[in-house]
Each structure stands twice: as structure tokens, then as C-alpha cells.
Amino acid sequence: MDRYPPIADHGLIGDLQTAALVSSHGVIDWFAAPRFDSPSVFAALLDHDGGGYFLLAPEHPEGTWKQLYYPDTAVLVTRFMSPDGVGEIIDYMPVRPGPKATDRHQLVRVARTVRGTVRFELACRPRFAYARADHRLDLTPERATFHAPGATAHLQGDIPLEQDGQDVRGARTLNAGEAAAVVFTMC
């Protein structure tokens, strides 16, 4: 993984209120919420070691990578061909209509194996308020909850999570035709 990939190696997903940058190797390395000009939650784009990130990628990332959007959408598809197989990571942020559009923002990430068998790894390391605010982790079998001053985030989905300090990680092996989704929600 390139510690500081060029902006050209990123895709943009958003929900009309804020946006996230997704590197071509499956790392969300910039996300601010609840608005574009809010303090960051993930900022590895600026500080790889301390800025925080959300990784969903094959365990062995060697190979060819390409990003594209589903036609006429803001749904980003990151495709890869590796020695283990061919897979995709699909990223998007659902749009919430109405007056509560800024109350909750979701990063939806789907890992899918097209051919072969691929082990996907996940690492969620939020660093709230430009990494200036400490957070506390509550981990249950259903979800991980990150508590920071003035912010709460939840991570849940089809990939089993385990504690890694105040962060979480996980992994899941997918065979051809299988998919697993995770959702990061800012409240």
C-alpha cells in the first residue's frame, strides 16, 4: 500500500452533504462529517501514521487495480486481479432526503469475489477531529461503537470484528460469487 497515493489514484463517494476519498487499493483515507468542512474522521491522506483510515482490501494486494463508477451513479467499484482471484470493493454513501439529511452519514462497503478465493481484511481506525480527539471503543458481537467528544460512529456488517487497541480489524474469506458488506455510520 502506497503511504501517500496521488489524488489521481482516488475515487470520490458522497451523499450531497459530505464525501470520502477511496484510494485505488481500498483505503478510505479522507472523510469528514457531518459536512465537507467538518473535522476529519479519516485523514491518512494527510498523515498516514496518525490520521486514521478505513481499509477493506484483499489480504494479498499484489496485482492490477482499477477504479470505475457504475454508469450514472456515485457508486465506486474498485476491481483487482491478484494471484488469489478477481474481486471488487464497492463503495457508496446513501443519500438521506429531507430535513434530517445531515443527522447521519453512512459509508457502505461491499467486498465481492468474482473468481477464485480471496481473503479480505478490514481495519477501521477512526481519528476524530483531525486526530486531536481521543475515542473509546465498545465492541459487541453485533457492532463496534466509537465514542469521541461530540461524535459517535458505528461499524457493523458481515465481517467478524476484533479489538485492536481502540480500533477494530477483521477478515473474511470469500469464494467466487460471495459478498460481504460493512457499514460505517456517523451519528
Residue spans for each PLM region:
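Beta-sandwich/jelly-roll carbohydrate-recognition scaffolds of carbohydrate-active enzymes
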Residues: R3-C187
